[in-house]
Amino acid sequence: TEEEIDWVRSKEADKGLPGKIVEASYFGYELNNRQEADFETVGAELKTTAADYDEATARYKSGETISVTQIDFRRPVETDFYASHLYDKLRMLIVIFYHRDRTLASKLLYRVFFASLFRPSEEDIAIIKSDYREINRKIRAGQANTLSRSDGTYLSTAPKAKKRTNMITPYYGGERVVKRSYTLRKEYVNVILSGYYTRREPEEHLITDLHELDRMGFAQIVQGRFSQYVGWDIWDIVGTLNLHAEQTRDELGFPDIPVGVMNKATLPVITARMLGLRSLKCEEFTRAGIIVKTVFFNRHGINKEKFRLGDVDFMEIYNAPAPHTEMETDDDGNEEEVYQTGWEESELFAQLDSIKYLFVVFQKDADGDIIFMGSKLWAMSDEDIEEARQDWMDIKSVLTHGVQLRIGNDGRTYNNFPGVAEARCIHLRPHGAKAFYVNADGTSWGNGCISDTEPLPDGRRMTRQSYWLNNSFVRKVVRDLITVE
């Protein structure tokens, strides 16, 4: 009806608008947040979600997590996973993907391009069940306030409220909490989306005995694989794993160690062998979006590595809406006032919301030996995401008020974006070796070319930048694994 069309147009800013339109117009649904599956007869749950098009790979990729069902903090948890509302909704999903084309003037122009009837595999259900158990362990211990996006391997939790109003007193006690829902991680949603393309060859599995997941969580299993090697010199690990012959110091990644012991024993191979894998490409890591990173510390507990996240699109940040308040409809159909900054629609948020690192930590001791210190499976917590948001807002402020470029006495070009010393956890710096700058009048300088640049809002161009995790931030994450002399 005209009235319904007018209502839809008034909700243009609502992040969930495309999904609500599909569910209401195509399936005739009223907005609901029922605990039962949407199609009760066949036990299927309907989900509509965004996908972005990656020009580099010429493929669609998942644009967000999928919220499966709300966590009811006011009631006792269901300890039997198979009797839970989560399993009821998760066992069969109808997932509709639409292309989130940010170049279009309206969300109403987004195009639906793929629908999938998806059943999680037995292996996936085993890991999700383990995630569910670990999340509920926190809730039952009165620690619901410690739940975070970093929980879980395939299944996580995410806050439902945009502001801390209507806080809930949990059934099991502890601090009051905001609404949260069980969510499927973005990389797992990519597994569903991969059905749009030719099916890929399966990778090897880290977990071959699913009963392991009845005894411990995925993170504990990973740590268990590494635990026998903690405190070992790297050469003892190499010998035990039977990785012999010659390798240059630079190829190995340890410039200070003597040459001469290994065959095909690059760090990824050493790490994979400790895990019992042939390579670091395994099904569990792919589906959870786990990236393995080796971190080196000197005897004083200092690391040099800064981890690159992805390239920066200055115009995407600049064009994000200015901070403002607007009305949005929640999953219960109620309107609430929310504070919008454009952050949750940004490329950086999309990366950080899905990223999960397996940090493999080595440290040089007083004798100069390289010791394996342990591992940590880590994802950004809600608090970390908030720090990153503040860094992103600082970058946006520079773009809004003007990027300043200055040529120093050393001939290098400096800018006024916050540096690693000012940033909380994320800073900008170039990824490539080439630098190039173009003024609005067409004059240019640098040792690169136009393809090494990104446009600025005022018509100039500057060397392409990337987001990087601060080395001090990484140090804070793994500080319990290292020693400081």
Question: Language model features by range: what are they?
Answer:
Residues T1-G43, T48-E485:
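Nucleic-acid endonuclease domains
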